[in-house]
A protein has these predicted regions:
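Short, intrinsically disordered, mixed-charge
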Residues: 35-39, 74-78, 125
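Generic detection of short hydrophobic beta-strand segments and adjacent strand-loop junctions
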Residues: 21-25, 89, 135-137
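Short, intrinsically disordered/low-complexity patches at protein termini
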Residues: 43-44, 55, 83-84, 89-91, ...
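Hydrophobic beta-strand-centered segment that forms part of the acyl-chain substrate-binding groove
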Residues: 51-60, 65-104
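Catalytic strand-loop segment that frames the active site of acyl-thioester-processing enzymes
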Residues: 2-60, 141
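HotDog/MaoC-like acyl-thioester-processing domains
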Residues: 1-15, 95-147
Length: 147
């Protein structure tokens, strides 16, 4: 899925507004993340090692899931100009190589000064919740200086 970044005025958001994003977590994504961050933990990149663990196979980095939340917040909802204030992330289950995850974001509160609380829930194809949490963001529209 390609996300097209757009700026949305802060007053155009409503509580209950949702956005859904799907992503295949494949070997290329995991190895790219390992190279980018330097996190080459064997549980992520070594099939032989991972088979000997309780997981029985390689698992994706938790940071990949966090990054997907950031990608959707900044690119789709709320969109271009969104600024993170905080993010609570809970990891509930592993994401394995070639799992497809679905992220659903829901605006749960609109606060003063263009701040929003956004519930984040990520599931894999089985329906199992793998990540959840709450993002607090500054909504788009306030970022640019007035002309």
């Amino acid at each position: 899925m390609v996300i097209t970044a757009r700026a949305v005025p802060p007053n155009d958001f409503v509580v209950g507004q949702k956005c859904t994003y799907h992503q295949l977590v494949d070997d290329k994504l995991v190895r790219g993340y390992a190279d980018l961050t330097g996190d080459h933990n064997k549980i992520h990149v070594d099939d032989v090692f991972a088979k000997k663990t309780k997981f029985g196979q390689r698992i994706a980095h938790g940071g990949i899931m966090f990054g997907m939340i950031s990608k959707v917040l900044g690119g789709e909802m709320p969109g271009l100009g969104t600024i993170y204030l905080s993010q609570l992330v809970n990891f509930h289950a592993p994401v394995f190589i070639n799992d497809t995850v679905t992220l659903e974001l829901t605006i749960t509160a609109l606060l003063p000064k263009h701040v929003a609380k956004i519930n984040c829930v990520m599931t894999k194809q089985s329906g199992e919740v793998v990540v959840d949490g709450v993002a607090t963001v500054k909504l788009p529209g306030w970022l640019m200086k007035k002309a």
